[in-house]
């Protein structure tokens, strides 16, 4: 019988990677909590209409990439391709936006049916930062500064911030009309996808990945030529706030992002260290999304960090993996030893909860248990055999350096083990 393989484009995250992943997530969580953001968790499955109305019918995501299916009641459901729409829906459903402002973060898997390649997967993970009910460029700057702090905390310097403004609905309409006129003049040069989008949403032609279209797209009208006074003032203040904070950036008038709900500020953090998939974080304002989904007009801004890409960039920039190893591994040898050794290690866990202890389970000779202790990555082995049992003693043997073995009484084990590990210069893992 053949083995069942993982679905193409959906990767397993193995134990040697999860410890580093968790350590990075903890840095993000602590930083967001320090800025007053709270976690929200929303379903990974939503009604398909949520994404059609928010992301936009004429987008690659909705047209080509969503995992959509009918449930047993015939209702169309979709695995979430991004998190913002679900978070906004949750805010509306649960009354979080009634004369309130919310600073939220969330993390979890997203799903898009794309061609799998390095840095682009069909199941991928994002860390989302959302601020609902906040107007003005100050919150835009705060979120961008938070992301900058994340890179700094992880030792990542190979990133560049790109900024643009899409303007208000009125200025976006002017830009759309100019795009339509421009692409109509060059209709014969458009590929089939772009011709289909010309009447429905010409802005999405700018998302084209067709290399034959690049020159045409590069010469298209840009958003900054059509900005209204309000958007100009908003963007100018944002730039001043970033300058004041020492955040370097590049204004990219062709940055539009791939989802229809964006307005005013849009931004991306990009790197040249990961090949074609160089966007690590992207986001912007979506002031019209709540009303678009049936709620009251609510200003908002958010961004998403791609966790797989962030982890890869962390490694490329010299980040060290976090070892998910125990501090101590208990070796118990002899038929009469198991019960008292088991009780001893549980008592030690109560006394010293910060020390990570793995007990050998499943028996085995002294030699085989010591091999397991070494493979576990533990700093020390705790050894108890029949002689130690008779004397109520336990051996502490260093596994990572040649410093011999000492013996201590059971009642002294917690204090002695802490001191022994501290003297070896080993801190708590992770």
List each language-model region with its residue ranges.
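TRNA-recognition modules of translation machinery and tRNA-sensing kinases, especially anticodon-binding
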Residues: 1-430
């Amino acid at each position: 019988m053949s083995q069942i393989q993982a679905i193409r484009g959906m990767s397993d995250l193995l134990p040697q990677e999860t410890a580093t992943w968790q350590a990075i997530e903890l840095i993000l969580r602590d930083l967001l909590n320090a800025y007053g953001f709270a976690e929200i968790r929303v379903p990974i499955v939503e009604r398909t209409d949520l994404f059609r109305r928010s992301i936009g019918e004429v987008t690659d995501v909705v047209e080509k990439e969503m995992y959509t299916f009918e449930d047993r009641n015939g209702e169309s459901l979709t695995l979430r391709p991004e998190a913002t729409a679900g978070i906004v829906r949750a805010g509306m459903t649960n009354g979080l936006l009634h004369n309130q402002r919310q600073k939220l973060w969330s993390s979890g898997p997203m799903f898009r049916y794309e061609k799998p390649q390095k840095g682009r997967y069909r199941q991928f993970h994002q860390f989302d930062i959302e601020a609902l009910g906040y107007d003005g460029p100050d919150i835009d700057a705060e979120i961008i500064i938070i992301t900058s702090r994340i890179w700094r905390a992880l030792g990542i310097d190979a990133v560049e911030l790109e900024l643009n403004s899409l303007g208000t609905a009125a200025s976006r309409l002017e830009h759309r009309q100019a795009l339509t006129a421009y692409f109509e003049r060059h209709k014969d040069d458009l590929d089939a996808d772009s011709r289909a989008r010309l009447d429905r949403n010409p802005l999405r032609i700018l998302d084209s990945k067709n290399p034959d279209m690049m020159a045409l797209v590069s010469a298209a009208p840009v958003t900054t030529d059509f900005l209204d006074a309000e958007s100009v003032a908003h963007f100018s203040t944002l730039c001043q706030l970033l300058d004041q904070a020492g955040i370097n950036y590049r204004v990219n008038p062709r940055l539009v992002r791939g989802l229809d709900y964006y307005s005013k500020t849009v931004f991306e953090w990009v790197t040249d260290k990961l090949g074609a998939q160089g966007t690590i974080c992207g986001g912007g304002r979506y002031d019209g999304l709540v009303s678009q989904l049936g709620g009251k007009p609510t200003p908002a801004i958010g961004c998403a960090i791609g966790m797989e890409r962030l982890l890869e960039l962390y490694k490329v920039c010299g980040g060290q993996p976090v070892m998910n190893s125990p501090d101590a591994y208990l070796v118990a040898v002899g038929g009469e030893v198991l019960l008292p050794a088991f009780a001893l290690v549980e008592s030690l866990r109560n006394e010293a909860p910060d020390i990570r202890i793995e007990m050998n389970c499943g028996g085995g000779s002294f030699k085989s248990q010591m091999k397991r202790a070494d493979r576990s990555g533990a700093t020390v082995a705790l050894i108890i055999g029949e002689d130690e049992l008779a004397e109520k003693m336990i051996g502490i043997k260093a596994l990572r350096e040649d410093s011999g073995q000492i013996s201590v009484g059971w009642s002294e084990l917690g204090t002695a083990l802490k001191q022994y590990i501290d003297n070896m210069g080993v801190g708590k893992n992770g």
